[in-house]
Amino acid sequence: MHFTHDMKYLFIAEKPSLMRDVQACYRNHKQEVTERVGEIDFTALSGHVCTNCMPTDYEEWKDKSWKAIVYPMIPNPWQIKPIADRRKQETLAQIKRRAADYDGIIVGTDSDVEGYGIYWLMEQYLGLNEKPALRFIEHSLTDAEI
């Protein structure tokens, strides 16, 4: 996919503090950023919002005792579920509703394995994997670095 300045992105931050810092920088440099990347809107997670399903979440293992299960347990396909927290589920619902209005996503989770996992689980659960995604990698949260 070719990225152009007329595209519209949803920046999904891992935490509200990161969203506020990046959003403030964006406001200070909006014309320059818009000319290079496009328009950006912001939202924030509060860390993990999805998780892999537990064995008891799968129909084939739901009512079986651990002794009755054949190992290894390899679900096919793997399933993902939202974390059982009302605010996190509301955040997921909001992102799902809003995502259709954007050409792509800017992933603002921490640039480590855990941060990637937070986004990947959410992306798979919400079906965002067809949207182009750009990765925001933070080194520090100063205006110059952002």
Q: Which sequence ranges carry the predicted segments?
A:
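Intrinsically disordered, low-complexity regulatory segments
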Residues: 1-146
